């Protein structure tokens, strides 16, 4: 099982703002693009992939929306509009939830009022965490554990205080090359490397 976490620091937790944020400061299109490139392949979708989108621009709690490729039945297509609609349905389903509550949205999609920090602490129990860093080991040379989880951010970098807690969780740094890439581009390269290795 391969897992991805997108920490979307600018992404709002209100459906109207998600839809209005495409191409604006929130850059909510990154949610759809990352989701598309993690789960979908031509005429099908990948098995054994989990994607966690953590939306952090909120008045109450972050929303962690989880997509399980093995459980998803019909997401409505893999174009930007359909994928953002799935995110919106999850956000709408989360209204009225208290902190650290979980709710099933539809097959393969759950929403939790859970922070990024709490999520990665939970994932670290049975995954090896990897963070993108230009100074990390180049992915083609890096040793990738059996249950990898890759941590990505939107256009707002990971806050410095997060690095220490991620280090304590045993997070390893890997590099995808000399250029800074979009999260949606990172997942294409990561998936390709894992495919070539026969993961």
Curated annotation (Swiss-Prot):
Localization in the cell: Cytoplasm
GO MF terms held by the record: S-adenosylmethionine-dependent methyltransferase activity; tRNA methyltransferase activity
Predominant place of localization: cytoplasm
Keywords recorded for this protein, A-Z: Cytoplasm, Methyltransferase, S-adenosyl-L-methionine, Transferase
InterPro entries: Alpha/beta_knot_MTases, TrmY, tRNA_m1G_MTases_N
GO biological process assignments: tRNA methylation
Pfam families for this protein: Methyltrn_RNA_2 (PF04013)
CDD domains the UniProt entry points to: TrmY-like
One GO cellular component term noted in the UniProt record for this chain: cytoplasm
Residues that bind S-adenosyl-L-methionine: 132, 186
EC numbers on record: 2.1.1.-
Entry-linked PANTHER family: TRNA (PSEUDOURIDINE(54)-N(1))-METHYLTRANSFERASE
UniProt cross-references to NCBIfam families, sorted A to Z: PRK02135.1 (NF002560)
Family of the protein in this entry: Belongs to the methyltransferase superfamily. TrmY family.
UniProt protein name: Putative pseudouridine methyltransferase
Species this protein is from: Vibrio atlanticus (strain LGP32)
